[in-house]
C-alpha cells in the first residue's frame, strides 16, 4: 500500500467518522493503518463501545456480520465482500432443522466463526474460550455443535 493511499484512508476515516478494524489474518499493510487489530470475538465486542458511526471490518464475511449484529444502528463495511471462511459454511440451516426433528431436547451450539444465518437458527453462540463452560451449563441432554464437530 502506498503512502498516498494510507494517507487518503486516514483522511476518509476522520471525514466519515469511521474506524478500521483488522483481523490478525489480514495483510500487514492493512494492519498498519487499522485502528484496532485482533481476533473476531475481540473485534466484535470492541465495536460495541466505539463512537464511530461507520465500522470498516477488514476480515472475512462472518466477522462483518457479527459486528453488524452487535451494532445494528451503525454502518458496517466489509472492504472485500468475497472474503470468506470455509468453516463458516460447514453446517446448514437444513441440517439444524433435521437435527431438531431427530433429537428431542436439543440445544444447537454455534461457534462464533459461523454465518449470521446459522447463528439465527442456534440456541447459543460460543467462542473457543467459553464453549466448554457454556455447554456444561446447558440443561439440554442433546447438544449439536456447529459448524464443525472437531471444535466441540
Where do the model's predicted regions map?
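Active-site loop-to-helix "anion-binding N-cap" substructures in soluble metabolic enzymes
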Residues: 1-152
Amino acid at each position: 500500500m502506498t503512502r498516498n493511499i494510507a494517507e487518503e484512508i486516514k483522511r476518509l476515516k476522520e471525514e466519515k467518522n469511521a474506524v478500521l478494524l483488522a483481523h490478525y489474518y489480514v495483510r500487514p499493510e492493512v494492519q498498519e493503518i487499522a485502528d484496532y487489530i485482533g481476533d473476531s470475538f475481540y473485534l466484535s465486542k470492541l465495536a460495541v463501545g466505539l463512537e464511530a458511526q461507520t465500522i470498516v471490518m477488514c476480515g472475512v464475511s462472518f466477522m462483518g456480520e457479527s459486528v453488524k449484529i452487535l451494532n445494528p444502528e451503525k454502518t458496517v463495511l466489509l472492504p472485500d465482500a468475497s472474503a470468506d471462511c470455509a468453516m463458516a459454511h460447514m453446517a446448514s440451516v437444513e441440517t439444524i432443522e433435521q437435527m431438531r426433528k431427530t433429537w428431542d431436547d436439543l440445544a444447537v451450539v454455534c461457534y462464533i466463526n459461523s454465518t449470521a444465518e446459522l447463528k439465527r437458527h442456534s440456541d447459543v453462540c460460543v467462542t473457543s474460550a467459553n464453549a466448554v463452560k457454556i455447554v456444561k451449563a446447558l440443561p439440554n441432554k442433546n447438544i449439536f455443535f456447529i459448524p464443525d464437530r472437531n471444535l466441540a
